[in-house]
Amino acid sequence: MNTVLAQQIANEGGVEAWMIAQQHKSLLRFLTCGSVDDGKSTLIGRLLHDTRQIYEDQLSSLHNDSKRHGTQGEKLDLALLVDGLQAEREQGITIDVAYRYFSTEKRKFIIADTPGHEQYTRNMATGASTCDLAILLIDARKGVLDQTRRHSFISTLLGIKHLIVAINKMDLVDYSEETFTRIREDYLTFAEQLPGNLDIRFVPLSALEGDNVASQSESMLWYSGPTLLEVLETVEIQRVVDAQPMRFPVQYVNRPNLDFRGYAGTLASGRVQVGQRVKVLPSGVESNVARIVTFDGDREEAFAGEAITLVLTDEIDISRGDLLLAADEVLPAVQSASVAVVWMAEQPLSPGQSYDIKIAGKKTRARVDGIRYQVDINNLTQREVENLSLNGIGLVDLTFDEPLVLDRYQQNPVTGGLIFIDRLSNVTVGAGMVHEPVSQATAAASEFSAFELELNALVRRHFPHWGARDLLGDK
């Protein structure tokens, strides 16, 4: 057993007391990102090593792996603690998103180690979508690079407000304060154009040597700020979803027997209480919450992020993809929206194309009406383009096949975030963040043939009980 873990359990008075104490610690989700070979995996390995989160058998295996795959000579290659795929070890790079878990006396952590190569930007965006904080690594020898800017912009686009700029490999520039200051000023100049009110902090460190990671560096006495671990333990994270109105997307209708009918899902934002009056969208039907069922039994109330099953007092028609919210709240369904897109496919995103989209458990289809602009990563300016290529980031206008209930992504990532799915291959080809729902929109007649429009009108006239929508959007 890990000796530090054993000591913590002893200090708490046993395993049960230790587990209770762990449950009450705050949780911080963060990712490491940046350009290729900036030391992201090594930094995570150093954090795990210096906080004594590595078991003896893992340490022994690391010694052996360092001899076979290591890139640090006689030293331990701490990156191998994270880079688990064979291709990653052979190439000395990170490909997949690797998750690691550790805790200190003050906090619990979930780390997402994301790849730095441009071709794996999609993996980086996936890792960032669930994080509260980003550690952006910069090689002290290279300074701010294009991938540094791209990862910074994607992180802020995905709602991350806390950035730690870790200027790594300071040992290779003789721990130069001048180098640190220059890179800091360069990044701050770039960051002025990033959206939102950001909390940006700078830490000079050496992940390989351990300087300023978990303990103060004796080689950088000119730096009087906190270590990286101290920043992680003390940064105050305010989750947007806690203060937002209630949103409960239905993931699954749970009906194990004739006497029980519940609606399972994760509460996306706000809180819900037994007896609360709720409304189902898009139908608009109202009911009261009779029970809140969890794995640990019934609860009187639940909060954002908790997986629950709601039982209502009335037997009403609710299916996967429907949204429950407070009965007194008005949230109109929309059939169009402007969406910030991170494109992840070789085939460019072009106007006129249609994709399956998935948002908060609901799957439907959307058409690309136009591309307003693409963001130039170098200076964050907007430029007109005909299509959005691989790893491109831009603002796109979408029209949906059916009315959807949406929030802006910055208000609610669950009901404002979507993915694009290729209809033939079923591969995820893009990530979207709702910028602004458009209250009224109509489909373009040119999308449908004359036969399709006539057939649609015929079905709606003679078979209204089928509920077919008007392809032209005339309600």
From Swiss-Prot:
GO terms for molecular function: ATP binding; GTP binding; GTPase activity; sulfate adenylyltransferase (ATP) activity. It catalyses: sulfate + ATP + H(+) = adenosine 5'-phosphosulfate + diphosphate. InterPro entries: CysN_GTP-bd, CysN_II, CysN_NoDQ_III, G_TR_CS, GTP-eEF1A_C, P-loop_NTPase, Small_GTP-bd, SO4_adenylTrfase_lsu. It comes from the Bacteria. GTP binds at residues 34-41, 113-117, 168-171. It holds the Pfam family GTP-eEF1A_C. Residues 113-116 are annotated as: G3. GO terms for biological process: hydrogen sulfide biosynthetic process; sulfate assimilation. Keywords: ATP-binding, GTP-binding, Nucleotide-binding, Nucleotidyltransferase, Transferase. Disulfide bonds: none annotated. Residues 168-171 are annotated as: G4. Residues 92-96 are annotated as: G2. Pathway: Sulfur metabolism; hydrogen sulfide biosynthesis; sulfite from sulfate: step 1/3. It is an enzyme of class 2 (transferase). Residues 25-239 form the tr-type G domain. Residues 206-208 are annotated as: G5. PROSITE patterns: G_TR_1, G_TR_2. Residues 34-41 are annotated as: G1. CDD domains: CysN_ATPS, CysN_NodQ_II, CysN_NoDQ_III. HAMAP family: Sulf_adenylyltr_sub1. Belongs to the TRAFAC class translation factor GTPase superfamily. Classic translation factor GTPase family. CysN/NodQ subfamily. Heterodimer composed of CysD, the smaller subunit, and CysN. With CysD forms the ATP sulfurylase (ATPS) that catalyzes the adenylation of sulfate producing adenosine 5'-phosphosulfate (APS) and diphosphate, the first enzymatic step in sulfur assimilation pathway. APS synthesis involves the formation of a high-energy phosphoric-sulfuric acid anhydride bond driven by GTP hydrolysis by CysN coupled to ATP hydrolysis by CysD. This is Sulfate adenylyltransferase subunit 1. It comes from Escherichia fergusonii (strain ATCC 35469 / DSM 13698 / CCUG 18766 / IAM 14443 / JCM 21226 / LMG 7866 / NBRC 102419 / NCTC 12128 / CDC 0568-73). The lineage of its organism: Bacteria, Pseudomonadati, Pseudomonadota, Gammaproteobacteria, Enterobacterales. The gene is cysN.
